[in-house]
């Protein structure tokens, strides 16, 4: 079986890492994968290529509309690979996958199309204008895929309320390797030395990229309240807040209780 995954880009992110984890866990010789990144190379590209999976880049620039040449290249890439399944990832990838399948087999519809939605939809106005239009377009085209895969019941409910066809809904929660994400005393001690904080300090972590949907504003307000409360009661307890993720910098706050660690791969 030949499967194409189409995704916006391959920089570090939740969807990108889940794509990598999915590919790394499927070692069946009967499966042949191709990944298409609508933009350029990212930090996850080499990890996927190391699995023996080919990655094609369309080199779109962020915010730009695709030219006819780019659309035709996408169509040709899909036709040349001749897949059984095309899987879109997130709004841009879903629409691109839909266009690719339609142009590759407009009559026979021999390619099975699936969408993958990996976020909640509290307030679309906080999304970029292009993304908002793609969300609306996705509502109109939601009859097209065989299934729409969501990673949470809440995400499915919100998108169905926004007009996505509910009968297409499939829910597959995120999976995590508990052998990797487990307590490690040696790493724990080494990490505290790196941060130069005491063994008794309480560490509170927040891991996510900078995006209105992640609501760093509320978390920062909560930090201010905690710090203020500890000061008011004269507590000597040290509480350190670790903010980790792409775009999360000290421009957000000058609170000395906050450590901005940027993007990390050793969570």
Q: Can you annotate each of these PLM segments?
A:
Residues 1-267:
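Membrane-interface segments of envelope glycosyltransferases acting on lipid-linked substrates or membrane lipids
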């Amino acid at each position: 079986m030949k499967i194409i995954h189409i995704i916006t880009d391959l920089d570090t992110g939740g969807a990108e890492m889940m794509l990598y984890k999915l590919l790394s866990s499927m070692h069946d010789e009967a499966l042949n994968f191709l990944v298409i990144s609508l933009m350029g190379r990212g930090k996850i590209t080499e990890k996927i290529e190391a699995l023996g999976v080919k990655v094609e880049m369309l080199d779109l620039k962020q915010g730009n509309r695709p030219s006819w040449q780019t659309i035709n290249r996408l169509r040709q890439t899909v036709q040349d690979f001749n897949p059984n399944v095309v899987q879109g990832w997130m709004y841009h990838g879903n629409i691109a996958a839909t266009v690719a399948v339609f142009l590759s087999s407009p009559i026979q519809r021999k390619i099975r199309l699936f969408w993958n939605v990996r976020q909640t939809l509290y307030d679309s106005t906080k999304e970029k204008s292009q993304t908002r239009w793609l969300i609306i377009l996705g509502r109109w085209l939601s009859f097209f895929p065989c299934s729409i895969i969501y990673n949470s019941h809440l995400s499915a409910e919100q998108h169905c309320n926004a007009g996505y066809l509910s009968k297409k809904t499939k829910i597959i929660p995120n999976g995590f390797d508990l052998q990797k994400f487990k307590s490690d005393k040696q790493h724990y001690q080494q990490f505290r030395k790196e941060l130069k904080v005491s063994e008794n300090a309480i560490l509170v972590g927040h891991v996510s990229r900078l995006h209105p949907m992640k609501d760093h504003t509320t978390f920062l307000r909560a930090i201010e309240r905690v710090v203020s409360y500890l000061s008011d009661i004269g507590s000597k307890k040290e509480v350190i807040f670790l903010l980790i993720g792409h775009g999360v910098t000290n421009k957000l706050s000058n609170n000395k209780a906050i450590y901005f660690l940027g993007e990390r791969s050793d969570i």
